[in-house]
Protein backbone atom coordinates (compact mmCIF):
# COMPACT_ATOMS: atom_id res chain seq x y z
CA UNK A 1 0.00 0.00 0.00
CA UNK A 2 1.34 3.40 -0.97
CA UNK A 3 0.79 5.97 1.76
CA UNK A 4 0.84 9.66 0.97
CA UNK A 5 0.60 10.78 4.56
CA UNK A 6 3.43 12.02 6.77
CA UNK A 7 6.69 10.10 6.99
CA UNK A 8 7.17 7.61 9.81
CA UNK A 9 10.63 8.99 10.59
CA UNK A 10 12.05 12.30 11.76
CA UNK A 11 14.85 14.18 10.00
CA UNK A 12 17.31 12.69 12.46
CA UNK A 13 16.16 9.13 11.71
CA UNK A 14 14.12 8.65 14.88
CA UNK A 15 10.60 7.20 14.77
CA UNK A 16 7.54 9.46 14.82
CA UNK A 17 4.54 8.65 17.01
CA UNK A 18 1.37 9.04 14.92
CA UNK A 19 -1.74 10.57 16.48
CA UNK A 20 -4.05 8.62 14.15
CA UNK A 21 -4.13 5.59 11.87
CA UNK A 22 -3.74 5.68 8.09
CA UNK A 23 -6.87 6.86 6.30
CA UNK A 24 -8.25 5.79 2.92
CA UNK A 25 -7.95 9.32 1.47
CA UNK A 26 -4.18 9.17 2.07
CA UNK A 27 -3.89 6.05 -0.08
CA UNK A 28 -1.77 6.23 -3.22
CA UNK A 29 -1.10 3.80 -6.07
CA UNK A 30 1.74 2.69 -8.26
CA UNK A 31 2.10 4.79 -11.46
CA UNK A 32 0.41 3.46 -14.61
CA UNK A 33 3.57 3.80 -16.77
CA UNK A 34 1.72 3.70 -20.10
CA UNK A 35 3.70 1.84 -22.76
CA UNK A 36 3.47 1.63 -26.55
CA UNK A 37 1.51 -1.47 -27.55
CA UNK A 38 -1.94 -3.00 -27.94
CA UNK A 39 -4.53 -0.83 -26.14
CA UNK A 40 -5.13 -1.95 -22.54
CA UNK A 41 -6.98 0.15 -19.96
CA UNK A 42 -7.80 -0.24 -16.28
CA UNK A 43 -10.79 1.32 -14.50
CA UNK A 44 -10.23 2.65 -11.00
CA UNK A 45 -12.71 4.05 -8.47
CA UNK A 46 -11.83 7.60 -7.50
CA UNK A 47 -13.34 10.10 -5.09
CA UNK A 48 -16.88 11.36 -5.51
CA UNK A 49 -18.39 8.29 -7.24
CA UNK A 50 -16.14 8.86 -10.24
CA UNK A 51 -14.06 6.45 -12.31
CA UNK A 52 -10.51 6.97 -13.56
CA UNK A 53 -9.38 5.27 -16.75
CA UNK A 54 -5.70 4.33 -16.72
CA UNK A 55 -4.07 3.50 -20.02
CA UNK A 56 -1.65 0.65 -19.34
CA UNK A 57 -0.63 0.52 -23.00
CA UNK A 58 -1.80 2.23 -26.20
CA UNK A 59 -0.71 2.57 -29.81
CA UNK A 60 -2.94 5.47 -30.96
CA UNK A 61 -2.83 9.20 -30.24
CA UNK A 62 -5.08 12.14 -31.08
CA UNK A 63 -2.62 14.52 -32.75
CA UNK A 64 -3.48 18.21 -33.14
CA UNK A 65 -2.00 20.28 -35.98
CA UNK A 66 -3.38 23.78 -35.59
CA UNK A 67 -7.18 23.38 -35.55
CA UNK A 68 -7.21 19.95 -37.20
CA UNK A 69 -7.11 16.87 -34.98
CA UNK A 70 -6.41 13.43 -36.42
CA UNK A 71 -5.77 9.97 -35.02
CA UNK A 72 -2.22 8.73 -35.57
CA UNK A 73 -0.40 5.52 -34.76
CA UNK A 74 2.36 5.75 -32.13
CA UNK A 75 5.62 4.20 -33.29
CA UNK A 76 7.92 4.85 -30.31
CA UNK A 77 8.97 7.32 -27.61
CA UNK A 78 11.83 9.58 -28.74
CA UNK A 79 12.42 11.57 -25.53
CA UNK A 80 10.85 11.79 -22.09
CA UNK A 81 11.97 14.68 -19.83
CA UNK A 82 10.31 13.21 -16.72
CA UNK A 83 12.74 10.27 -16.56
CA UNK A 84 15.82 9.35 -18.60
CA UNK A 85 14.95 5.65 -18.60
CA UNK A 86 11.34 6.15 -19.75
CA UNK A 87 12.39 6.83 -23.38
CA UNK A 88 14.26 3.54 -23.73
CA UNK A 89 11.42 1.68 -21.98
CA UNK A 90 8.85 3.34 -24.35
CA UNK A 91 6.82 4.81 -21.46
CA UNK A 92 4.47 7.68 -22.34
CA UNK A 93 3.86 10.52 -19.86
CA UNK A 94 2.80 14.14 -20.23
CA UNK A 95 5.57 16.10 -21.99
CA UNK A 96 7.05 13.05 -23.72
CA UNK A 97 8.02 13.40 -27.38
CA UNK A 98 6.61 10.55 -29.46
CA UNK A 99 7.15 9.46 -33.05
CA UNK A 100 3.78 9.02 -34.78
CA UNK A 101 2.61 8.29 -38.31
CA UNK A 102 1.84 12.04 -38.59
CA UNK A 103 5.32 13.09 -37.37
CA UNK A 104 6.88 13.99 -34.02
CA UNK A 105 4.50 15.19 -31.34
CA UNK A 106 4.58 16.29 -27.70
CA UNK A 107 2.08 14.57 -25.38
CA UNK A 108 -0.29 17.08 -23.75
CA UNK A 109 -2.53 14.69 -21.77
CA UNK A 110 -1.85 12.40 -18.82
CA UNK A 111 -2.49 8.88 -20.14
CA UNK A 112 -2.28 7.31 -16.69
CA UNK A 113 -5.15 9.56 -15.51
CA UNK A 114 -7.35 10.03 -18.61
CA UNK A 115 -6.80 6.78 -20.51
CA UNK A 116 -5.92 8.40 -23.83
CA UNK A 117 -2.96 10.13 -25.48
CA UNK A 118 -3.47 13.65 -26.83
CA UNK A 119 -0.49 15.28 -28.53
CA UNK A 120 0.54 18.38 -30.51
CA UNK A 121 2.77 18.19 -33.60
CA UNK A 122 6.13 19.93 -33.07
CA UNK A 123 7.80 19.78 -36.51
From Swiss-Prot:
TM stretches of this protein: none
One Gene Ontology cellular component annotation held by this UniProt entry: ribonucleoprotein complex
UniProt protein name: Small ribosomal subunit protein eS8
GO annotation (BP), single: translation
Biased composition, class Basic residues, residue ranges: 7-26
Name of the gene this protein is made from: rps8e
Stretches the record annotates as Disordered: 1-37
Complexes and interactors: Part of the 30S ribosomal subunit.
Alphabetical UniProt keywords: Ribonucleoprotein, Ribosomal protein
Pfam families reported for this sequence: Ribosomal_S8e (PF01201)
